[in-house]
């Protein structure tokens, strides 16, 4: 009887004991000791990882493996820690070890493929690749009409799009799932056959009305403000305006179909000039359609002549970008990146290279009834296509993206108030481009494959309107003569933060030093002479970049480094490889921008980091100043989402590893990730 009771008690104990890690060493007491030590180090490693202490977590996972060599779960986590620390080669090595042990399945294999691909291919997203349909927004819901004859669209920073519905005289806003979230009909008497919509530099919208012979101005939310223009052939008059564009000075350009010309208005709506009539070297427009302004160059398509023509801001003809007859019936023409135009032609979408006029076919909708009247790039790297005749709105994605799906990563799990759990999840495509605008319906969180309770989407970092900034100052000898410019640049950057977020100043001397950390308002009287770090012939810039990034890992979800330099530093990257530094910044969503205090070119190393981390290079005396640098950082898309749910797991007093999974869906694309965490010790 005593023996039976003993066996029963032993069974109960074993059923509830911690069995997260299995010892591969010899049996007996050594097995129990090794498992216990490994589990404790593993728990510490997971907690360090979620605190953003990646180097510390690497050491703790290595200790766990010293007790349990080859444990796949620990190998997976060690790979994650190396990845976030920017050491992607070591991360891939650990993940491959885990994969060879039969761990992770397709999920781990996909992660290895994506990270490997990112390391060996260019970060450039590629403007000449093929796109194919990944989804569409229906024009009816049961017996209810949603839109009719979509004619143009405009992307928004939150992932949504505006669509002009020509047939219903409306401007509609769709979220990423194709749900209408806002519907506008213009002035009191309504739109009169709206044709195109653009966003002006002040944030307002401009809508051309082809039957109303006018241009309406709306707020950023679509509320009507005013309109200008009138029917006629005189200055500032229109007959059937079609497509719109705006230049750097706020002037608005409209292709005037009825008068076969382009009409230019100032920012207030006053007519300035018109052009496109027959002149020397140019025989005049026959049917001007799409228009795009790129710097000081104006490009106009003609649907009858089938070419693209270039003018200056005064309306002088400069030449032919794409020869007559190249296109069958070109319509919309929009700038795409800095080097291409996006053009629609019947059932096709083309990319046109600005430097050469080379034409690349990007997408085709088929051979049926089709007339594509606009194609624009959205916030997620798709092309939104409006098909006037087919009455469809298509979402076109790169073919490689449809095959590979999303790259989804758990970045942090906060379980301090267990059973309430908060998780932060990042969603990207295979080329590291964030996926923004997702809603709660696009996610499914499970624990042990069972849906969690009280699941709520708390927010999306992409909607944040401020950022934390690290200002990195070059202390090379050449910077001595730029102290006045440096002081002014720091003050201007800090002032443009409007007292929001935190700013730190790191000086890149022989040894990097954190000179300041606090509210940007405290830098209103900053002077370069107050910096403690001495000038040096060889500043340790790589260590300074690493130090700057370390301070931003746990900062606001939007964050960036701004490097101030005269541009001629050499031999400054000796401790860390450029690829590892760039990976560290990218894997923690930290951008790197450069402000040059002289007209010298930045070093190749700095250019590489700036180019590959969503950064931008600025000259201190550029006409618009440095006031928009912070805004540019805030405007960088972020695919980070935060959720809250209630866990149903037992924690074994905080010693049990609790699994959690997430799946993300959008139209015909999906992605998933798995992780785990520990509740607080009791």
Where are these regions (language model features)?
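Blade-level signature of beta-propeller repeat domains, shared across WD40, Kelch, NHL, RCC1
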Residues: 367-409
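Acidic, polar low-complexity linker/tail segments
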Residues: 404-470, 477-482
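Exposed acidic/Ser/Thr-rich ligand/metal-binding surfaces
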Residues: 274, 484-487, 495, 499, ...
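Beta-rich, blade/repeat-based domains predominating
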Residues: 142-158, 188-201, 234-248, 280-295, ...
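Conserved beta-propeller blade signature
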Residues: 160-163, 204-207, 251-254, 297-300, ...
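C-terminal "exit" segments of structured domains
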Residues: 401-404, 414-421, 611, 621-682
